[in-house]
């Protein structure tokens, strides 16, 4: 048999370590990563690169390639934005309010 004795105490729930603002930013950027590149692809395909035949290939191939490059650029901009926001948040948490010196 086991020598362990139950104390009858329930385990304490872990304290909330995830800040709501961090979770909000993560969800926001995840949604942006899902929506913006797809929207960029179809909007540039239909409005910006419509009928682009400057590359020497059939116009459909050129416009889809340019639209895909536009979507990749949009996704990378969102990713860079997330990294910038994360670094700013980290720097702000490190430079919190300084403790006041007590004068006696």
UniProtKB/Swiss-Prot annotation:
Subcellular location: Endoplasmic reticulum membrane; Endoplasmic reticulum-Golgi intermediate compartment membrane; Cytoplasmic vesicle, COPII-coated vesicle membrane
Motif (Prevents secretion from ER): 101-104
Main localization of the protein described in the UniProt heading: endoplasmic reticulum
Transmembrane segments: 22-42, 66-86
GO biological process: vacuolar proton-transporting V-type ATPase complex assembly
Topology within the bilayer: Multi-pass membrane protein
Pfam family, one: VMA21
GO cellular component: endoplasmic reticulum membrane; endoplasmic reticulum-Golgi intermediate compartment membrane; ER to Golgi transport vesicle membrane
Cytoplasmic side, ranges: 1-21, 87-104
Keywords assigned: Cytoplasmic vesicle, Endoplasmic reticulum, Membrane, Transmembrane, Transmembrane helix
Residue numbers on the Lumenal membrane side: 43-65
Family according to the record: Belongs to the VMA21 family.
HAMAP family: VMA21
Function: Required for the assembly of the V0 complex of the vacuolar ATPase (V-ATPase) in the endoplasmic reticulum.
Protein name, as recorded: Vacuolar ATPase assembly integral membrane protein VMA21
Recorded name of the encoding gene: VMA21
């Amino acid at each position: 048999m086991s020598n362990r004795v139950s104390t009858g105490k329930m385990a304490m729930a872990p304290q909330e370590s995830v800040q709501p603002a961090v979770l909000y930013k993560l969800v926001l950027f995840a949604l942006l990563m899902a929506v913006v590149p797809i929207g960029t692809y179809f909007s540039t395909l239909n409005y910006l690169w419509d009928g682009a035949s400057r590359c020497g290939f059939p116009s459909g191939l050129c416009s889809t390639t340019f639209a895909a490059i536009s979507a990749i650029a949009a996704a990378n901009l969102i990713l860079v934005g997330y990294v910038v926001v994360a670094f700013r948040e980290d720097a702000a948490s490190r430079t919190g309010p300084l403790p006041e010196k007590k004068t006696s």
